[in-house]
């Protein structure tokens, strides 16, 4: 109807009105509408979003030119926590998904597992293309496999083969085989800990985990795992929003505890953890960029999402903090030292093998 109305207006107007717009002006007309949905507002999600927008820009899709973005961040009440708060989040996600389905955008970006898992059914029924990012394991959000998400859905995942990641951990810390992990009911966190436990068994290592509430102080759980030197020999940080809440309080306390007790802290996700000696995992910004490349194909070429495989960072990033290693009196094996490169903020990047 809008096209017919425009045609009629042009026919009735003066001859000057039917002159074509300059190419530059046409390119700047809003062309694509993208909705973004996420739960909580944490730094890693912002990195993923920035990567996504960067990929669209690289494909000539840009806000103010031919892109409109509406971003919704569903709050999680960390102070209340618990079942009812989580149920409320699920309901909010579904309400937003219904609103988005009615708005009929060209594409939806879901950041994180909860937004993806609880919005996808509604968006699939409405035939609105869904691209996700910052998901630990696609299978946990309803995908058929790591690479196939079924009708109407594709995206990028933070998935890293946990056995390979722990092999790198063991190369840096060969004398530590008992790993402690503290997590919440965060879906990415639960999946990450389960994967770590399975990968550790294959390597003759062991993971002992403690679940806490998002409002809990982490220190009692650390003490229970450490058992005054009789328990775990290192701590590993899973992909859990808990560590990004309250200005990184849990992460800071974990780093301090590790320093006081000469226990290495490693993180199995590229999330800022003050005091961590080793980082192994996919980078949120890089994974967000991968999602953006898939979105560009859907928007520009009208490619169906199910045609596009789920992408992931093939070689995870490995960073070490040399100052923290020195404080722990740990020296890297010569084979790793020989292939290190200087990274930002004084870190060393190790070659992934």
Enumerate the predicted regions with their spans.
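N-terminal signal peptide c-region/cleavage motif recognized by signal peptidases
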Residues: 12-14
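Hydrophobic alpha-helical
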Residues: 107-122, 214-279
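An alpha-beta-alpha
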Residues: 52, 153-203, 309-324
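Hydrophobic alpha-helical segments within soluble ligand-binding/sensing domains
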Residues: 18-26, 137-148, 153-178, 282-303
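Hinge/cleft segment of the Venus flytrap/periplasmic-binding protein
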Residues: 18-23, 297-353
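Extracytoplasmic "Venus flytrap"
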Residues: 20-22, 29-51, 59, 64-66, ...
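Beta-alpha junction/loop-to-helix N-cap segments that form part of ligand/metal-binding clefts
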Residues: 75-140, 241-256
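Hinge/beta->alpha junction and helix N-cap segments in small-molecule ligand-binding domains
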Residues: 44, 70-89, 156-162, 183-192, ...
């Amino acid at each position: 109807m809008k096209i017919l109305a425009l045609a009629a207006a042009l026919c009735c107007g003066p001859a000057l009105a039917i002159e074509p717009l300059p190419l530059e002006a046409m390119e700047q007309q809003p062309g694509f509408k993208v909705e973004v949905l996420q739960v909580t507002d944490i730094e890693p999600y912002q990195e993923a979003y920035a990567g996504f927008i960067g990929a669209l820009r690289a494909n000539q899709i840009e806000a103010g030119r031919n892109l409109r973005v509406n971003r919704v961040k569903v709050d999680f009440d960390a102070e209340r926590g618990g079942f009812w708060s989580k149920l409320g989040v699920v309901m909010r996600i579904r309400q937003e998904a219904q609103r988005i389905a009615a708005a009929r955008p060209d594409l939806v970006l879901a950041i994180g597992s909860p937004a993806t898992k609880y919005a996808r059914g509604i968006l699939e029924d409405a035939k609105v293309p869904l691209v996700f990012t910052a998901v630990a394991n696609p299978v946990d959000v309803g995908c058929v496999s790591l690479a196939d998400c079924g009708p109407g859905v594709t995206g990028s995942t933070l998935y890293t083969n946990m056995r390979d990641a722990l092999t790198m951990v063991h190369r840096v810390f060969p004398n530590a085989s008992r790993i402690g992990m503290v997590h919440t009911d965060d879906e990415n966190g639960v999946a990450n800990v389960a994967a770590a436990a399975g990968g550790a068994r294959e390597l003759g290592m062991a993971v002992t985990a403690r679940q806490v509430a998002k409002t809990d102080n982490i220190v009692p759980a650390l003490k229970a795992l450490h058992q005054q030197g009789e328990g775990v020999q290192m701590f590993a940080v899973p992909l859990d929003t808990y560590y990004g809440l309250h200005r990184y309080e849990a992460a800071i306390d974990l780093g301090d505890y590790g320093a006081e007790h000469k226990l290495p802290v490693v993180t199995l996700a590229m999330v800022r953890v003050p005091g961590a000696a080793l980082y192994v995992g996919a980078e949120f910004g890089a994974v967000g960029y991968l999602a953006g490349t898939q979105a560009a194909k859907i928007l520009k070429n009208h490619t169906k999402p199910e045609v596009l495989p789920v992408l992931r960072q093939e070689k995870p990033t490995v960073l070490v903090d040399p100052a923290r290693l020195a404080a722990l009196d740990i020296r890297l094996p010569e084979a790793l030292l020989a292939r290190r490169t200087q990274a930002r903020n004084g870190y060393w990047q190790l070659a992934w093998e």
